[in-house]
Amino acid sequence: MKQKVVSIGDINVANDLPFVLFGGMNVLESRDLAMRICEHYVTVTQKLGIPYVFKASFDKANRSSIHSYRGPGLEEGMKIFQELKQTFGVKIITDVHEPSQAQPVADVVDVIQLPAFLARQTDLVEAMAKTGAVINVKKPQFVSPGQMGNIVDKFKEGGNDKVILCDRGANFGYDNLVVDMLGFSVMKKVSGNSPVIFDVTHALQCRDPFGAASGGRRAQVTELARAGMAVGLAGLFIEAHPDPEHAKCDGPSALPLAKLEPFLKQMKAIDELVKGFEELDTSK
């Protein structure tokens, strides 16, 4: 079955092409740390021959606690992104939270991301669509895979069909997430075979029901990522940190930066194996 290709500059993203890595840090903690993390990702992905897009947030507007670190903000964040692009020649993805942010952010980065908690906000979707940028839609934890087609339709009605879908798990009772491996193919089907990627980092979240910050299951990142890659996906979304225990956001789910290369070697091997198989139709 023909898969839709979404192009991010010279990077082609599709479910039957070699996977694209969307990775970096959760939030911009500082200019120097962003440079360090981006350089490491670029070095490793170039060595392994993996197409790469750097990810970081300039504002974490959905933190649980009013006291949690949010990021440097729009103006300073865009300055850091511009320096990263000039220094490393890297593509960049970041999220927007308000309609007014869509165009200023799209003027700087290559992919704008619709956060899971905001994925049904029509005004935000319309503003993002109007930019003409490539869009990454995070599937809300409370939305079924089949409902993602409605969000894609909103973007198409807004004149933008350059949409990538991203799963980051589904609510499993209170304060826990699970990943439905059958949901990936449903998301492909309802979106006209748009590229589907897997955010393994945020799928590992598991919070203390009375705490102010998300916990995580970093020790299980490799096994969950292996399972997702075995489905046959367009890309993998993963955040890393040189010192996860002291990261300012989602450290418990972050891959230790030093483990990035061996981790990606495994992901690439699985991706190549699975996409080398003949497509088998078992529906009849």
Curated annotation (Swiss-Prot):
Q: Under which name does UniProt file this protein?
A: 2-dehydro-3-deoxyphosphooctonate aldolase
Indicate the family of this protein: Belongs to the KdsA family.
Q: Provide the top EC class.
A: transferase
Where does this chain mainly localize?
cytoplasm
Question: A Pfam family matched by this chain, by name?
Answer: DAHP_synth_1
Say if the entry is tagged with keyword Methyltransferase. Answer: no
Q: What is its EC number?
A: 2.5.1.55
Pathway(s) of this molecule: Carbohydrate biosynthesis; 3-deoxy-D-manno-octulosonate biosynthesis; 3-deoxy-D-manno-octulosonate from D-ribulose 5-phosphate: step 2/3; Bacterial outer membrane biogenesis; lipopolysaccharide biosynthesis
Question: What's the gene?
Answer: kdsA
Question: Which organism is this protein's natural source?
Answer: Escherichia fergusonii (strain ATCC 35469 / DSM 13698 / CCUG 18766 / IAM 14443 / JCM 21226 / LMG 7866 / NBRC 102419 / NCTC 12128 / CDC 0568-73)
Single GO term (MF): 3-deoxy-8-phosphooctulonate synthase activity
